[in-house]
Design a protein with these regions (language model features):
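Charged, low-complexity intrinsically disordered segments
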Residues: 2-206
């Protein structure tokens, strides 16, 4: 059963985002807020995803939620091939690394883009942490608002908690695979699930 007060949780999460922007709060507060609601007895439905390849080429599925999923969109006159490209381009831009920025824009392979993102010069962890969530939200907002078929899929997830069930990512994912016993128990997640929260934020804005 999905409780009707889901919107209250989303509002609380969005308030945490605003507060974090204004007061430099940690983005771990997003997970903390969800956990607090669960501890009070609220229950939610969950949609776990991981990977960017569709099972059937003709049918949009949850693979479209991935940062690596191929989906063209434009922001401020610049064309992007996937949200991984946007995220890493903005990372390079944030630290004024024009060389890596241009290399990222001229590469559409998300694996290579991710590697380039790790080469950004003058990188400072605290600065990236302060900006990463908003960057991913903006990239996904453009992706889903400019691709109607993808937007319809995201909206079809309704009130589900979106979970990046990556066993190897404890920042953007939950640090657990979808078939793990705790994948649908946020109280036992090993990661922050920032991508999942960003997608839910975008869903609310569409």
């Amino acid at each position: 059963m999905i409780y009707s007060d889901y919107d209250d949780c989303v509002i609380s999460v969005k308030k945490e985002v605003k507060d974090r922007q204004e007061n430099k709060m940690s983005d771990s507060q997003l997970l903390t807020t969800l956990q607090e609601h669960i501890k009070r007895g609220q229950k939610y439905g969950y949609l776990c995803f991981w990977g960017h390849r569709q099972k059937t080429p003709e049918k949009i599925d949850k693979s479209c939620l991935s940062q690596w999923y191929p989906a063209k969109f434009e922001i401020e006159g610049v064309d992007y091939q996937n949200t991984e490209q946007y995220m890493m381009a903005q990372k390079a831009k944030l630290f004024n690394d024009e060389n890596i920025f241009q290399q990222i824009l001229h590469t559409d392979d998300p694996k290579k883009i991710k590697a380039l993102g790790r080469q950004v010069k003058n990188y400072q962890d605290e600065i990236w942490i302060a900006h990463r969530y908003e960057i991913v939200v903006q990239g996904n907002l453009a992706k889903f608002s400019q691709n109607n078929h993808l937007q319809q899929f995201l909206l079809s997830t309704s009130e589900q908690i979106i979970v990046e069930a990556s066993p190897v990512d404890q920042i953007w994912g939950i640090g657990l695979a979808a078939d793990h016993a705790d994948a649908m128990n946020p109280l036992k997640w090993k990661g922050l699930n920032l991508l999942g929260f960003a997608l839910m934020d975008v869903r609310k804005q569409l």
